[in-house]
Every structure is written in structure tokens, then in C-alpha cells.
């Protein structure tokens, strides 16, 4: 794949954990390593990561980068050092606020958008930030959903092309034939029907609704249990809720290593994350790449209808779309799939095929490469 020399500027990159971090890493791994540099903050275990990274790592001493003149000067120096032809900001806020100045000095840029840019698009007083950051961008690739893209497009008022670039999954890592017996044994799940939820533990993701739904699910599917994978600020509250149920109903794995994550998806019979919109519409699920990773493992998905999450499945074919605010709806959807393994299996296989057809990283990176070429000087 031929691409112009590209400097990725981002606060979000491994070994820091998160969905944006994994998306950006997956994209740059598909680009020619000698054509890419990554300008990003320091993080725990960064030295070990950088030592084996195939692309150039330009690690900065701070833990978070703000759009200051000093950071702008360092970006320009890094771009000159690698003779970069284009800058890709991994997110619009905050670092793409430096983009117009870079463009004025002859360095074109793309400004990626995610769920947070939705908030910038609709929250009072923040439109100006978004419009300024993208005012001289060659393009805004929205690395989540058409829902977010529509909102961003309205906010920037047509001043820049806004295009959806749906994230994907590594189908060699996330696949259905992984060995998971040790996970089930260690968590004392055995061969019981298992619902898995992989996500950061925050209120929007809906783990609390899953916990509330488990008694109704178990009344239909005796022995069913729930595995919650991930960490976050809601963990104490969720563990307290789980403590009100029998000890064998809910298991928490905590944060798991990136290399182990596919096996946790594969360990389940159904994947569920009944995400919900909060704060009067200010907080939505921009996409939910966990649904794509679960589908790649041939798991049927139960998806909360918030923001762009509905775009991650074909309702009734690869999973079931639910109102994540309604415990009964979540219990019915999960219970239906656990009670009908043949239907669940068919949905899971359809989901994996959809990932193979439309959500593989090489194809996604090829679209990005086209936009980078369009932005680079002729």
C-alpha cells in the first residue's frame, strides 16, 4: 500500500488502554511502517511497547498533550525530521486545534472524530472549537458511525468533507475457534450458559441493566451467568449490585491483557452491552467496537440502542437491538438467544461474515490511505 509520509498526532495510543487507542494502532499497523510516525504522550510500559513497534514512535514526556505553542513547535519539528507530507490528528479535540496553524505553514492535515466530537457538536458553546479545529482540514474521518458523522457535518456547516470510516476487527485474532476452557474454569463458570460484556465500567455501557436482568434470564435458562470484563469508575457500584445475587451468577474478570481479550469474547454464548443515552442526550454510544469484535468471534450481540451503536449490527440477523433502559427488554433478548442455541449460533456466524465482508482493517486502512493521498501536496 502506497501512502504519503504521515505523522499521526494523538493523545490516544497504546500501551494506554481504550477503544480509540486500539483503533488508531490497528490503522497504522496496516500502513507501510517506513511511511508513518506516531507523535504521542508517555505512558506506563511505553518503552517496552516502542522497542518493538514497527513504525517510528515519537514519544513525548507528558502524560497528556495540550495544544500549546510549545507542542505545536514539537509537532512541526517531528514532521520536518521525517519529511512528513500530511498530519493525521487521531482526534479533533484538543490537538487538532493546532491544525489551522500547521496548514498555514504548508502542512496539510486530517482531523479524526469519535464520540467526544458528538458532544462538541451539540453542547452549548463548543461549536466554535470544532469549527476552528477543522476549518482548514482536508477531511474529517469519523472513526465510529454515520450517526456521529451527521452531527459533526451539521456542526461544521459543510466547510470540510466529513466521511465515515467504520472501525473493524483483526479477524485472525478475534475468531470463534479459540481455547477458552481455562477462563471458564478459573472463573468457576464451567459449561453453564454464559453472557459476556466487555467494556469500560461506566454507567452508559449498561452493565447494571444486565445485572438486574439476570434473575429473569435465569428463570428461563437455569444456571445462566454473566461475565463482566473490564475496569472503570462504576466497578464498586456494580460489584455491590452483583452481591445481592447468588455468588455464582456474576463474575468479574477485571481489566485483562490485550492479547487475552479475544478469548474472553469467545468464552461466551452471547455478547451483550445494553448501552443507553444519558444526560439528556449529551452522552451517547458513538459506535461500540466491542460489538464488531464479538461478531468476529461468531457471537450473537445484544446491542443497546444509543447513538451509533445500532449501526454495528443487522437487527434480527447478527443480533438483537434493545432499549438499554428497559431491563425487561434486555432480559428477553438475552434469554431468547440463550434458550435457542441454534438461532444464536446462526446469528453469530452471520455476524462474523459481516465483519469479513465490511470490517477488516486492511480494507479500512486502504480507504484512509486514499484520503491521505488526497490531502498530500501534489
What is the predicted function of each stretch?
Residues 236-262, 270:
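Nucleotide-activated donor-binding/catalytic signature segment of Leloir-type glycosyltransferases, i.e.
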Residues 175-189:
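A short helix/loop element that forms part of the nucleotide-sugar donor recognition site in Leloir-type
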Residues 266-284, 299:
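Acidic donor-binding loop of glycosyltransferase active sites
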Residues 314-316, 320-327, 336-342:
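Conserved acidic donor-binding segment of nucleotide-sugar-dependent glycosyltransferases
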Residues 223, 329, 336, 343-357:
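A short, well-ordered alpha-helix in the C-terminal region of glycosyltransferases
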Residues 89-95:
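Short His-centered aromatic/hydrophobic patch
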Residues 291-296, 300-303, 313:
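Short hydrophobic beta-strand element within catalytic cores of glycosyltransferases
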Residues 9, 189-205, 211-215:
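Conserved donor-binding/catalytic core segment of Leloir-type glycosyltransferases
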Amino acid at each position: 500500500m502506497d501512502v504519503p509520509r504521515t505523522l499521526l498526532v494523538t493523545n490516544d495510543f497504546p500501551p494506554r488502554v481504550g477503544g480509540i487507542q486500539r483503533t488508531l494502532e490497528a490503522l497504522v499497523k496496516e500502513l507501510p511502517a517506513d511511511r508513518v510516525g506516531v507523535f504521542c504522550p508517555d505512558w506506563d510500559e511505553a518503552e517496552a511497547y516502542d522497542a518493538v513497534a514497527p513504525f517510528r514512535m515519537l514519544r513525548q514526556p507528558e502524560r497528556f498533550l495540550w495544544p500549546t505553542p510549545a507542542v505545536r513547535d514539537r509537532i512541526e519539528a517531528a514532521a520536518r525530521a521525517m519529511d512528513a507530507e500530511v498530519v493525521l490528528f487521531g482526534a479533533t479535540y484538543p490537538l487538532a486545534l493546532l491544525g489551522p496553524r500547521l496548514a498555514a505553514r504548508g502542512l496539510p492535515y486530517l482531523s479524526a472524530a469519535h464520540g467526544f466530537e458528538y458532544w462538541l457538536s451539540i453542547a452549548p458553546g463548543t461549536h466554535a472549537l470544532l469549527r476552528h479545529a477543522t476549518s482548514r482540514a482536508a477531511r474529517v474521518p469519523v472513526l465510529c458511525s454515520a450517526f456521529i458523522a451527521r452531527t459533526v457535518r451539521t456542526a461544521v456547516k459543510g466547510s470540510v468533507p466529513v466521511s465515515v470510516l467504520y472501525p473493524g476487527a483483526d479477524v485472525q485474532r478475534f475468531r470463534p475457534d479459540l481455547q477458552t476452557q481455562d477462563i471458564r474454569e478459573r472463573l468457576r463458570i464451567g459449561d453453564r450458559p454464559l453472557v459476556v460484556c466487555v467494556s469500560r465500567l461506566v454507567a452508559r455501557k449498561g452493565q447494571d441493566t444486565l445485572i438486574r436482568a439476570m434473575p429473569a434470564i435465569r428463570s428461563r435458562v437455569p444456571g445462566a451467568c454473566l461475565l463482566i470484563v473490564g475496569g472503570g469508575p462504576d466497578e464498586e457500584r456494580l460489584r455491590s449490585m452483583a452481591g445481592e445475587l447468588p455468588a455464582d451468577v456474576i463474575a468479574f474478570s477485571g481489566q485483562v491483557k490485550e492479547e487475552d481479550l479475544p478469548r474472553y469474547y469467545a468464552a461466551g454464548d452471547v455478547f451483550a452491552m445494553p448501552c443507553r443515552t444519558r444526560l439528556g442526550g449529551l452522552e451517547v454510544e458513538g459506535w461500540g467496537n466491542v460489538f464488531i469484535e464479538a461478531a468476529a468471534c461468531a457471537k450473537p450481540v445484544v446491542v443497546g440502542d444509543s447513538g451509533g451503536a445500532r449501526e454495528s449490527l443487522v437487527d434480527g440477523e447478527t443480533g438483537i437491538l434493545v432499549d438499554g433502559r428497559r431491563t425487561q427488554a434486555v432480559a428477553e433478548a438475552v434469554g431468547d438467544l440463550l434458550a435457542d442455541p441454534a438461532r444464536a449460533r446462526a446469528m453469530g456466524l452471520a455476524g462474523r461474515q459481516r465483519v469479513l465482508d465490511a470490517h477488516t482493517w486492511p480494507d479500512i486502512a486502504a480507504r484512509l490511505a486514499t484520503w491521505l493521498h488526497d490531502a498530500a501536496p501534489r
